């Protein structure tokens, strides 16, 4: 069993894959690895670039698909064929710091953590010009023995994760009812995790080019709402404090969609927003179901089905 499995969904990344894969090749540290790339029916030359750029790397799998389902589905697909103790999850249009994986893996083993999150740095450079810096030894790391509480905060949505494969399986991976995995993955993992590490280590460097699905604002609002709504409905046993927090997040996502011009029950939403601020909103009430229906009616978002 390898120490880590890189699980890497790919969609139309032909132009940037050579630089990302170069940073994979340049990883330092004493660990064994396998590489699982899952192509999401790319319409560019991503598959041929993957084959060319990974030639000579041991233990590479390239999983091909004929339909486009989104990163949440493809991440789960890749995780199912992984065999490593830990999964390493990155976006394929960034550059990885040379000791990123060794740093995350070392932290996980030192603290007995089953999920570790690193930071990212947005640059003004094209990806070809990025020279990611080595992570220093004296990085600050917060240890969270209540992972769900931390996951309901901010700052964990970037794909800079190292997680135990067993935890990923136990949590069911990403919510496949939501196209983008950024919000659902940390939430679902944290609900089952024993220890989450949040480190200041900058593990990926992000170029000033291209576009992320999560840059689409209505897609972002839709997927945030659906993530929290699904989680609420799937976990009726959650503590009331967490249910209240999740309800607030649903209201916030809907309010932002309304602000951006999408049809929502406006007056009721404003009342719900202020009720949530006062801790009076009931997350189990019918109003969230009405918002769910409103989001389902929005045509300008991508859905796995």
Protein language model features and the residues they cover:
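Short, well-formed alpha-helical segments that are part of the catalytic scaffolds
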Residues: 13-26
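Membrane-interface aromatic/basic loop that binds lipid-linked glycans or pyrophosphate carriers
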Residues: 1, 260-305
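Conserved donor NDP-sugar-binding/catalytic core segment of glycosyltransferases
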Residues: 101-131
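Glycine-rich, basic loop-to-helix element that forms the pyrophosphate-binding segment
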Residues: 65-82
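Short aromatic/hydrophobic "clamp" motif used to bind/position activated sugar donors
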Residues: 87
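Conserved nucleotide-sugar donor-binding catalytic segment
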Residues: 141-219
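Catalytic core of nucleotide-sugar-dependent glycosyltransferases
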Residues: 201-209, 214-241, 262-277
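A conserved acidic beta->alpha catalytic loop
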Residues: 39-48, 67, 91
């Amino acid at each position: 069993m390898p120490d880590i499995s890189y699980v890497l969904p790919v969609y139309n990344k032909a132009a940037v894959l050579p630089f990302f894969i170069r940073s994979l090749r340049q990883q330092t540290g004493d660990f064994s690895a396998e590489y699982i790339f899952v192509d999401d029916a790319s319409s560019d030359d991503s598959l041929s670039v993957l084959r060319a750029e990974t030639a000579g790397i041991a233990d590479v799998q390239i999983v091909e698909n004929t339909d486009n389902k989104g990163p949440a589905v493809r991440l789960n697909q890749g995780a199912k064929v992984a065999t490593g103790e830990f999964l390493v999850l990155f976006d394929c249009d960034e550059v990885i710091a040379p000791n990123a994986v060794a740093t995350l893996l070392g932290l996980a083993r030192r603290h007995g953590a089953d999920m570790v999150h690193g930071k990212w740095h947005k640059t003004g450079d094209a990806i070809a010009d990025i020279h990611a810096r080595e992570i220093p030894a004296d990085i600050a790391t917060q240890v969270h023995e209540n992972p769900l509480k931390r996951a309901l905060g901010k700052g964990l949505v970037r794909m800079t994760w190292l997680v135990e494969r067993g935890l990923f399986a136990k949590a069911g991976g990403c919510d496949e009812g939501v196209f983008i995995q950024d919000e659902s993955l940390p939430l679902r993992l944290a609900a089952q995790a024993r220890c989450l590490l949040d480190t200041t280590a900058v593990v990926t460097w992000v170029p000033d080019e291209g576009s992320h699905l999560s840059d689409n604002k209505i897609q972002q609002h839709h997927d945030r709402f659906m993530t929290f709504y699904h989680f609420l409905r799937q976990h009726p046993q959650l503590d009331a404090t967490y249910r209240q927090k999740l309800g607030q997040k649903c209201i916030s996502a809907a309010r932002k969609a309304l602000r951006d011009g999408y049809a929502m029950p406006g007056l009721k939403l404003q009342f719900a927003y202020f009720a949530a601020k006062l801790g009076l909103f009931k997350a189990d009430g019918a109003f969230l179901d009405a918002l769910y229906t409103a989001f389902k009616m929005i045509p300008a978002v991508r859905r796995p089905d």
